[in-house]
Design a protein with these regions (language model features):
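Phosphate-handling architecture centered on phosphoinositide signaling
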Residues: 188-252
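Bacterial N-terminal signal peptides that target proteins for export
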Residues: 1-11
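Aromatic-lined ligand-binding clefts that engage carbohydrates, nucleic acids, or primary amines
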Residues: 38, 61, 83, 91, ...
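Exoplasmic/lumenal beta-rich domain surfaces
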Residues: 119-160
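Surface-exposed, low-complexity/disordered Ser/Thr/Gly/Pro/Asn-rich loops and linkers
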Residues: 54-90
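N-terminal signal peptide c-region/cleavage motif recognized by signal peptidases
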Residues: 17-19
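Short beta-strand-plus-loop segments that form exposed binding edges in beta-rich domains
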Residues: 176-185
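GGW-centered surface loops in extracellular recognition modules
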Residues: 24-54, 221-225
Length: 252
């Protein structure tokens, strides 16, 4: 079987994407756990318009350990039955410049929208991107949480180009609104984690959850790989095949 020029290029891109990722990320740490202390607002009315911003004063909000919700036995803070819930927590970044990837792990019932320092970064199962759902908006469909059943949370992966303008060294805020899918819904879950891909050997945060899986492969943007292009020129322009040896020169 012959290896076409297109296949060779695809192989090289995949290979150098992996190598570049390995060089960019030294290790992963987790800066937010689901069980951290969160400020929360039960959605019986609309929250303050600035509720997701770092500058918002949460003194009038309740406080509790996440997850926050009811039923399913995956909640550390129990709340009354509700159509929506708003939660937020601050976290401190020692040096934002060494953070190259961020992973938001989300385990929820039934829908959510997440904001980083007031800017939407992820949503699932509700509404239109960029439009904040009102407190009385229901999820598009039913969605069950996974962790309490032995499953894994969903992951939302962001490279540096996507979050660089959103974070800074010092205090930052992760804010999330969670919505049920019907007035009679029997449960609500809100378990969220935030993990960081760090480019140096500094250790300023916490170990990753045991189930955490660092992103690899196509989830890593080739735009982040600052490596030279490898050019292979075969002798007499012979097409590369799988088995026969081919005399070639590799150059940059």
């Amino acid at each position: 079987m012959k290896l076409s020029k297109k296949s060779l290029i695809t192989f090289l891109l995949a290979f150098y994407s992996f190598i570049g990722y390995a060089q960019v990320i030294d290790h992963w740490e987790t800066v937010i756990y689901n069980t951290d202390q969160w400020s929360y607002f039960v959605g019986n009315s609309e929250p303050n318009a600035n509720w997701a911003n770092t500058s918002f004063n949460t003194s009038s909000w309740s406080k509790g350990s996440g997850g926050i919700g009811y039923e399913d036995e995956d909640d550390n803070t129990i709340i009354p039955q509700t159509r929506s819930l708003y939660i937020r927590t601050n976290f401190t970044l020692v040096d934002a410049s060494v953070i190259k990837y961020i992973v938001l792990n989300a385990d929820y019932d039934d829908a959510f929208v997440a904001y980083l320092n007031g800017t939407e970064i992820a949503r699932s199962n509700i509404g239109t991107v960029g439009v904040r759902p009102s407190y009385n908006t229901y999820a598009d469909t039913y969605h069950e949480a996974n962790l309490y059943q032995g499953g894994l949370p969903e992951d939302y992966i962001f490279n540096e180009a996507e979050f660089k303008s959103l974070i800074s060294s010092g205090t930052n805020t992760l804010a999330i609104q969670i919505h049920n899918n019907s007035p009679s819904s029997s449960d609500l879950s809100s378990n969220f984690f935030l993990s960081l891909g760090i480019s140096d050997q500094s250790k300023n945060y916490r170990e990753n959850p045991s189930w955490f899986q660092a992103p690899t492969g196509p989830q890593v943007s080739l735009l982040d790989v600052k490596l030279p292009i490898v050019v292979i020129t075969t002798e007499n322009n012979i097409e590369i095949q799988n088995e026969p040896k081919v005399t070639a020169q590799m150059g940059i």
